[in-house]
Amino acid sequence: PNVIFIIADDLGYGDMSCYGAHRVQTPHVDALASSGIRFTDAHAVASTSTPSRYSLFTGHYAWRRNDTGIARGDAGMVIRPEQTTIADMFKSAGYTTGAIGKWHLGLGDKTGTQDWNKKVSPGPEDLGFDYSCLMAATGDRVPCVWMENQQVLNYDPSAPIEVSYTKPFPGEPTGKNNPELLTNLKPSPNHGHNQAIVNGISRIGYMKGGGKALWKDEDIADTIIAKTVGFIERNSDKPFFLYVGTNDVHVPRFPHPRFVGKSGMGYRGDAILQFDYTVGKILEALEKQGLRENTLIVLSSDNGPVVDDGYQDQAVELLGDHRPWGNLRGGKYSNFEAGTRVPFIVSWPDKVKKGKTSDALVSQIDLFASMAELVGQEMQSGAGVDSLSLIHI
């Protein structure tokens, strides 16, 4: 089958209506769940982004290395080219591979040495991905540009890009010194989101330049959708593996105007609606190409939820009785269960029974071995050493 991983960002166990939320409705995710298996005891591998995604792609626990913590925006690539990834495995099986959206695994060889005005290597192409269009860092970290096949998308030669995580650039405004320029979102105190200003929002890290390449936060979801749909259309005649990492519901939460105010829960609730919309558009693209029945979709989150994560977006004030963590304790950054226990849905209409709920204990780290068994690939020596196949489940 074709295989798509949809990995949300900071989406909690209780954030969607198919997992018990009642203040926010997620009809597209609910439809996906009803078309397959909804797992109730599934876990990300860590309660933060970088180690979670590292383990998802490699099948190795992140704690086996000491450089897999939350990556800076100018981090060198955390997964090394000599490591075997799940994308390498799919390529060996004859699949076309792609990675779109949130990455947070670094680019280039060493931290702080990238020239963002050229192709940055090593990158996803060295990890088995034929195509990539990724956020260079995270939504709240500079550089705020898209990297398509490891080069800045819509690069503006009149505004060369410079990035620093050690000192500001002279003459460049910052959230700390120029709060009057924060026209879209203001940071919460003591979270560090008071440095470079892009799109009226201050970030972590310092940046100058970018020009026409700089993203607008309200368009990030639409860019992910457009690039995902394009990949599906280009590869509709051959098997593909596609990783889609959404920016929703990570900070800064600044959804498209079509969603603003629709949830009644502020920007965080609106971002959940935007995530559901994204899922719907991916399903729609598969249907249009006649691929839905033979496409296995795994939907999950990189870690548990966080409400106040550094911006004044009324997420706390408007939360009401919504419980992003469900009936669990903890959340993102936490060792308690809600830090890693996340939504996990598997849908493959051709093969997987519809409308099933499973309380089996599963982990994202086991997707590597599971997919290898699915496509008939033996695990290479040293590959996915912590991954066990869950195909029997």
Residue ranges and their predicted role:
Residues 1-391:
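Formylglycine-dependent sulfatase
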